[in-house]
């Protein structure tokens, strides 16, 4: 057996339409799939441009609550301009800090799921 990659990370959200608007229109993720199996089951899957790992915006289920995911990391090549652009789109980001061969800022989605925006300044993510 060999696990070869992380395919999809489920993000629990209280309102899939609001979350879709945030991830697609504010963060710029690409919508891959939006399929409603029934009124209770909807699969909303997005991906950052150029990435392989996707996210799925899911209604919370047993053991999962909206806003309960923390420490998700996305990478940028220019944290300063990305920080300014996202701030201009209404995202509340922390100040940029530098440590461990990288520059970081944090933010939350509308449900409180926590993200880290990183720009590698060394071999940290090589």
Regions found by a protein language model. Name each.
Residues 62-66, 123-126:
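A short local loop/turn or secondary-structure capping micro-motif enriched for an aromatic residue
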Residues 1-4, 8-11, 32-35, 42, ...:
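Vicinal oxygen chelate
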Residues 10-52:
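Core segments of cupin and vicinal oxygen chelate
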Residues 49-54, 63-64, 79-81:
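Short, charged/polar surface micro-motifs in flexible loops or helix N-caps
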Residues 55-58, 115-116:
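Conserved beta-strand in the GNAT
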Residues 71-75, 79-83:
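Mid-chain, well-packed structural core segment of small domains
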């Amino acid at each position: 057996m060999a696990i070869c990659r992380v395919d999809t990370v489920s993000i629990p959200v209280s309102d899939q339409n609001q979350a879709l608007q945030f991830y697609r229109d504010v963060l710029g993720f690409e919508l891959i799939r939006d399929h409603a199996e029934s009124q209770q089951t909807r699969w909303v899957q997005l991906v950052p441009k150029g990435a392989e790992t996707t996210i799925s915006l899911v209604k919370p289920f047993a053991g999962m609550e909206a806003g309960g995911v923390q420490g998700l990391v996305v990478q940028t090549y220019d944290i300063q301009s990305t920080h300014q652009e996202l701030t201009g789109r209404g995202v509340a980001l922390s100040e940029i800090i530098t440590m461990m061969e990288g520059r970081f800022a944090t933010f939350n989605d509308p449900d409180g799921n926590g993200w880290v925006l990183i720009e590698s300044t060394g071999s940290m993510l090589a």
